[in-house]
Amino acid sequence: MVKFRFAPSPTGHLHAGNARLAVVNALAARAMGGTLLLRIDDTDRERSKPEYEAGIEQDLRWLGIGWDEMARQSDRMDRYAAAAERLKAAGLLYPCFESEEELAAKRALRAKRHLPPVYDRAMLSLTAEQRAAAEAGGKRPYFRFKLSDGAVAWNDLVLGRREVALGTVSDPVLIRADGTPLYTFTSVVDDLELGVTHVVRGEDHVTNTAVQIDLMRALEPRRAVPAFGHLPLISDVTGEKLSKRAGSVSVRQFRRDGIEAMALVSYLARLGSRRDPEPLTLEELAGTFDLGDFSRGAPRFDPKQLLALNRRVLHGLPFEAVAERLPEGCGAEFWMAVRGNLDLLSEARLWWEVVSGEIETPSLPEAASLLRAALEALPPEPWDETTWKGWTGAVAAASGARGKALYLPLRLALTGESHGPELAALLPLIGRARAAARLERAAG
């Protein structure tokens, strides 16, 4: 069974970079007929918060992303402890006693000698007596995994063949001095025990993947490791790293700003791929989804492109899809009249005020004669979408005005705006009494 996973840490709000990974993993799982595991990586006791976890789940549901299985790392501490004991028994997890200052001094010395900052494995040579003496002196050990010799290679689902020489990498710390397991370790144990077959994450994990593959082989030598894929990290429009601490790129903020879930999902699903973004459902996106479509260059997250896609989404939404989010009293006729002019759904409220409330009618003394002619030619109700053409034809005949000289003063008087939805559709919604009052006020 194919199983992908999305593994956020509940240390903040879900941001665009992580949301993209959620979308990509969900789509890949659907495309391959597999399942999606939501794993909450909450071993950082100080920074992990229940409210962030709840917020992540809420954001995923808003995006339309469901999961088939859920796991929480804080519930699996016994599994990490058991795996650590197996590694210790095999001589692959060894205690270390250096302080941060001592490690920094070692790195500085290696840099001075023009050597890579790789851990020197000094603690491997400690005798049992030396270790006991260190602990008796109040030092608490942290534990490193002894990497294999040679290199680790894999066929990356996005980047192609990748190879990392393990001699260029420090033996990773798996267990802190306080006994807390670190991500490199917990992630491997979870992927093995929970049956994850595909891991798709950011390109910043490439070296970490080599380490984790080596660790997987140490824990389960007879088991196939998952397939790995690494997406290039998102940058902003200037090419700089997209900061996940910038509130403006959190899913929560996009939602508050009025971005539609379909627009955000469609944008993130195609960001960095050879396919142009278009407004599609998750099912439609999954139908053509292929990890091989993603390029190896860093994609740029452009809010203007997202807004343009949001506009396209709104223009195609039926009334039933938005009815509950529109101002009270709005009907299908209103929605069909204004949807083609919206960037954000919240803008519908402004046009509802235009057709049903009071507006600040501009004074247009230079167009007074035209507006009085329009008032006199205003036909009796009932009105429909043909009323506008007949009425403006009569006004043109009476005033001699044509084109912009005819239509702009009427639009300003009736809506208070110089641009907007087609007046043929708005006029029946405004109604005769309101239209007459506005024309009279504008004429002065």
UniProtKB/Swiss-Prot annotation:
Gene behind the chain: gltX2
Protein name per its UniProtKB record: Glutamate--tRNA ligase 2
One of the record's GO molecular function terms: glutamate-tRNA ligase activity
Domain of life: Bacteria
InterPro entries for this protein: aa-tRNA-synth_I_cd-bd (IPR045462), aa-tRNA-synth_I_codon-bd_sub2 (IPR020751), aa-tRNA-synth_I_CS (IPR001412), aa_tRNA-synth_I_cd-bd_sf (IPR008925), Glu-tRNA-ligase_bac/mito (IPR004527), Glu/Gln-tRNA-synth (IPR000924), Glu/Gln-tRNA-synth_Ib_cat-dom (IPR020058), GluQ/Sye (IPR049940)
EC number(s) reported in the record: 6.1.1.17
Subcellular location: Cytoplasm
GO biological process, one term: glutamyl-tRNA aminoacylation
Lineage: Bacteria, Pseudomonadati, Pseudomonadota, Alphaproteobacteria, Acetobacterales
Binding, ATP: K244
Keyword Aminoacyl-tRNA synthetase in annotation: yes
SUPFAM superfamilies, per database record: An anticodon-binding domain of class I aminoacyl-tRNA synthetases, Nucleotidylyl transferase
Enzyme class: ligase
Gene Ontology CC entries for this record: cytosol
Alphabetic keyword roster: Aminoacyl-tRNA synthetase, ATP-binding, Cytoplasm, Ligase, Nucleotide-binding, Protein biosynthesis
Catalytic reaction list: tRNA(Glu) + L-glutamate + ATP = L-glutamyl-tRNA(Glu) + AMP + diphosphate
Pfam families in the cross-refs: Anticodon_2, tRNA-synt_1c
Subunit structure: Monomer.
Locus of motif 'HIGH' region: 8-18
The protein's role, per its UniProt record: Catalyzes the attachment of glutamate to tRNA(Glu) in a two-step reaction: glutamate is first activated by ATP to form Glu-AMP and then transferred to the acceptor end of tRNA(Glu).
Span(s) of short sequence motif 'KMSKS' region: 241-245
Family listed: Belongs to the class-I aminoacyl-tRNA synthetase family. Glutamate--tRNA ligase type 1 subfamily.
